[in-house]
Curated annotation (Swiss-Prot):
Keywords: Carbohydrate metabolism, Lipopolysaccharide biosynthesis, Magnesium, Metal-binding, NAD, NADP, Oxidoreductase. One of its GO terms (biological process) is lipopolysaccharide biosynthetic process. It is an enzyme of class 1 (oxidoreductase). NADH binds at residues 10-12, 30, 39-40, 63-65, 128, 132. The lineage of its organism: Bacteria, Pseudomonadati, Pseudomonadota, Gammaproteobacteria, Enterobacterales. This is dTDP-4-dehydrorhamnose reductase. Changing residue 68 to A: Slightly reduces enzyme activity. GO terms for cellular component: cytosol. Its cofactor is Mg(2+). Homodimer. Binds 1 Mg(2+) ion per monomer. Mg(2+) is important for dimerization. Involved in the biosynthesis of the dTDP-L-rhamnose which is an important component of lipopolysaccharide (LPS). Catalyzes the reduction of dTDP-6-deoxy-L-lyxo-4-hexulose to yield dTDP-L-rhamnose. RmlD uses NADH and NADPH nearly equally well.
Length: 299
C-alpha cells in the first residue's frame, strides 16, 4: 500500500510519519518539498502530486492553523483549508484513493455544555472555523472514500505548546491568570496519529466506515485546570517555579482577533464504536508528554 502524507512537519504530521511507516510505503511532503508539490497555496500543484503518485491513501495534515491570523488573511485561509482540499479530493476520486483529513471543533458555535455530535448543526465563530468547515464539505462532496476527524486542543512534545508556555511563565512570574470558561480535552498528536493508522487499516477492509468522526482524548478540562496539572507535575519532578498564585479568569480577560468557543467538548462514541478503540483520558497523554519534557536533556 502506498500512502501520501501532506503536512509532514506539523505537530500531527510529525507523529504521522512515525505511525504510518509500518502501515505502507510512505511518501511524506511539506511546503518545502521539491520533487513533488506539497504546498497548499498551490491547489493545482498538490492535485498533480496525487495524480502522479496515485497513492492508495492520502493523509492531509496540512492546514492554516493560525486562528487569529486567519481573521486578517481569510483568502489564504480559504486557499489552504478548503480550495486545496477540494483539489485533492477531486484528484483522489479520479484515482480511487482514500483521503484522511483533520478538522476542528471550531465548526461549532461553542455554546452549551453538552459534547457536540457529528450530526449537530455547525455555525463557526471565526474565519478559521468557516474555512475548515468549507474544507470538510469540499471533501464530502468530491470524494466518497474519506475519513474526516474533527479534533480539538491539539498538543505535541515537538515544538511549542501550551504546557511549555505555562512552564516558562511560571518560572518567571509569581502570579498567572489562566482562562477557566473554555472547556475541552487536550489531545496529543501522538494519539491522533496512532488512531489514524488504525482507522486506515479498518477502512480498507470495511469501506462502509467512511465518513465524519469526532476524535479527542477522554474527559474534559479548562485551560486553568490544564495549567494547574502542568505545574503540579513540574513540582513533583523537582522543577523550581516562581509561581505562587494561579488565578482563574474569563475569556473576556484576554481579547483576541478571533472569537473562541466556550464549549469544545466532542462526543467520540461513533469513532470508538466503528473503530473498536478506547480513547484514553486526556491526563494520560499530557503527563506522558511532560515526563518526556522533564527527562530530555538538551544537547
Amino acid at each position: 500500500m502506498n500512502i501520501l502524507l501532506f503536512g509532514k512537519t506539523g505537530q500531527v504530521g510529525w507523529e504521522l510519519q512515525r505511525s504510518l511507516a509500518p502501515v505502507g510505503n510512505l511518501i511524506a511532503l511539506d511546503v518545502h518539498s521539491k520533487e513533488f508539490c506539497g504546498d497548499f497555496s498551490n491547489p493545482k500543484g498538490v492535485a498533480e502530486t496525487v495524480r502522479k503518485l496515485r497513492p492508495d491513501v492520502i493523509v492531509n495534515a496540512a492546514a492554516h492553523t493560525a486562528v487569529d491570523k486567519a481573521e486578517s488573511e481569510p483568502e489564504l485561509a480559504q486557499l489552504l483549508n478548503a480550495t486545496s482540499v477540494e483539489a485533492i479530493a477531486k484528484a483522489a476520486n479520479e484515482t480511487g484513493a482514500w483521503v484522511v483529513h483533520y478538522s476542528t471543533d471550531y465548526v461549532f458555535p461553542g455554546t452549551g455544555d453538552i459534547p457536540w455530535q457529528e450530526t449537530d448543526a455547525t455555525s463557526p465563530l471565526n474565519v478559521y472555523g468557516k474555512t475548515k468547515l468549507a474544507g470538510e464539505k469540499a471533501l464530502q462532496d468530491n470524494c466518497p472514500k474519506h475519513l474526516i476527524f474533527r479534533t480539538s486542543w491539539v498538543y505535541a512534545g515537538k515544538g511549542n505548546n501550551f504546557a511549555k508556555t505555562m512552564l516558562r511563565l511560571a518560572k518567571e512570574r509569581q502570579t498567572l491568570s489562566v482562562i477557566n470558561d473554555q472547556y475541552g480535552a487536550p489531545t496529543g498528536a501522538e494519539l491522533l496519529a496512532d488512531c489514524t493508522a488504525h482507522a486506515i487499516r479498518v477502512a480498507l477492509n470495511k469501506p462502509e466506515v467512511a465518513g465524519l468522526y469526532h476524535l479527542v482524548a477522554g474527559g474534559t478540562t479548562t485551560w486553568h485546570d490544564y495549567a494547574a496539572l502542568v505545574f503540579d507535575e513540574a513540582r513533583k519532578a523537582g522543577i523550581t517555579l516562581a509561581l505562587t498564585e494561579l488565578n482563574a479568569v474569563p475569556t473576556s480577560a484576554y481579547p483576541t482577533p478571533a472569537s473562541r468557543p466556550g464549549n469544545s467538548r466532542l462526543n467520540t462514541e461513533k469513532f470508538q464504536r466503528n473503530f473498536d478503540l478506547i480513547l484514553p483520558q486526556w491526563e494520560l497523554g499530557v503527563k506522558r508528554m511532560l515526563t518526556e519534557m522533564f527527562t530530555t536533556t538538551t544537547i
